[in-house]
Swiss-Prot record:
It comes from Thermotoga maritima (strain ATCC 43589 / DSM 3109 / JCM 10099 / NBRC 100826 / MSB8). This is Methylthioribose-1-phosphate isomerase. Catalyzes the interconversion of methylthioribose-1-phosphate (MTR-1-P) into methylthioribulose-1-phosphate (MTRu-1-P). Its EC number is 5.3.1.23. Belongs to the eIF-2B alpha/beta/delta subunits family. MtnA subfamily. Pathway: Amino-acid biosynthesis; L-methionine biosynthesis via salvage pathway; L-methionine from S-methyl-5-thio-alpha-D-ribose 1-phosphate: step 1/6. The record marks C154 as: Transition state stabilizer. Keywords: Amino-acid biosynthesis, Isomerase, Methionine biosynthesis. HAMAP family: Salvage_MtnA (MF_01678). One of its GO terms (biological process) is L-methionine salvage from methylthioadenosine. PANTHER family: METHYLTHIORIBOSE-1-PHOSPHATE ISOMERASE (PTHR43475:SF1).
Length: 343
């Protein structure tokens, strides 16, 4: 079997990933033939977005196992898994996908067609992601009124998944149901995923979109120009605390102050049942150059100190609901998240 979407393409021997660093100006694919190359693509944000990272890692796992030469196959598998796992610490889908692949490995380690079984599992994961996103979209669209203006942050669209998207999936599904929707996309410094990726996706779909600077959101909310905020997630704790792109917490505080519903759209696989609250979620710190430079040009003084956390945590008291493929979760989050996980 093969896979071909805008975000990624699996040929059976390699994984091609749309280089999201070069969008919206250049549509170019990077071909990965080894698990190390997939790990590099994840680390360098050639591919990004929690669900997309997870599926890319699953295909990287397949490529790595195929490169096995001699010695203990289990030891080699653990090396491959570790190389992929240490790329980005916050997105739980990465570890969920690798653990799922490892489980299949141990269940079939003695089978002659082990590599084929692993490839089929990665493909199954990819196609499941598309269906999950469409279900998230359908569930979330019911919360969006006709004529709404939606504020979103970063990119939780088709580019952040195998296809369709989570937060943008909600917007897509609302539009597909006949609703008139307008979107304000935060530019999302420092990597500009909103300006570069979200705007690009929505324009291709013919959905009305405005790019705004991150610090405009409060002004727009106060003027009554935002009806709802819809964002994605990289990890959700058992109590509903949510890690997402840096700046999400600020939007949630502003939304709460202005009585605007704040929705998180994410697959159940983004919920980490081993973490009770957001205080336990590891936050990735990225290179200072992402802040001091923009478009390859330095915009800050030489030698200035920089903080560059890639994510922040929004506590559950600021979240109106979490939209998943299994349904919409409302407070009390810990109780209702446990119910969803049991479904």
């Amino acid at each position: 079997m093969k896979l071909k979407t805008k975000t990624m393409e699996w040929s059976g021997n390699s994984l091609k990933l749309l280089d999201q660093r070069k969008l919206p100006f250049i549509e170019e694919y990077v071909e990965c033939k080894t698990h190390e190359e997939v790990a590099h693509a994840i680390k360098e944000m050639i591919v990004r977005g929690a669900p997309a990272i997870g599926v890319a890692a699953a295909f990287g796992y397949v490529l790595g196992l195929r490169d096995y030469k001699t010695g203990s196959l289990t030891d080699w598998m653990k090396q491959v898994k570790e190389t992929l796992a240490r790329t980005r610490p916050t997105a739980v889908n990465l570890f969920w996908a690798l653990n799922r692949m490892e489980k299949v490995f141990f269940e079939n380690a003695d089978r002659e067609n082990l590599f084929e079984i692993l490839e089929n599992e990665a493909l199954k994961m990819a196609y499941e992601d598309i269906e999950v996103n469409k279900a998230i979209g359908k569930n979330g669209a019911q919360l969006i009124k006709d004529g709404s203006t939606i504020l979103t942050h970063c990119n939780a669209g088709a580019l952040a998944t195998v296809d369709y998207g989570t937060a943008l999936g909600v917007i897509r599904a609302a539009v597909e149901s006949g609703k008139r929707i307008r979107v304000f996309a935060d530019e999302t410094r420092p990597y500009l995923q909103g300006a570069r990726l979200t705007a690009w996706e929505l324009m291709k779909d013919g959905i009305e979109v405005y790019v705004i600077t991150d610090n405009m959101a409060g002004w727009l909310m106060k003027r009554g120009l935002i009806d709802a905020v819809v964002v994605g997630a990289d990890r959700i704790a058992l109590n509903g605390d949510t890690a997402n792109k840096i700046g999400t917490y600020s939007l949630a505080v502003l939304a709460k102050r202005n009585n605007i519903p704040f929705y998180v759209a994410a697959p159940v696989s983004t919920i980490d049942p081993t973490i009770r609250s957001g205080e336990e979620i590891p936050i990735e710190e990225r290179r200072p150059e992402e802040v001091t430079h923009c478009g390859g040009n330095r915009i800050a003084p030489e030698g200035v100190k920089v903080l560059n956390p890639a994510f922040d945590v929004t506590e559950n008291t600021l979240i109106t609901a979490i939209i998943t493929e299994k349904g919409v979760i409302r407070p009390p989050f810990e109780e209702n998240i446990k119910k969803i996980l049991e479904v």
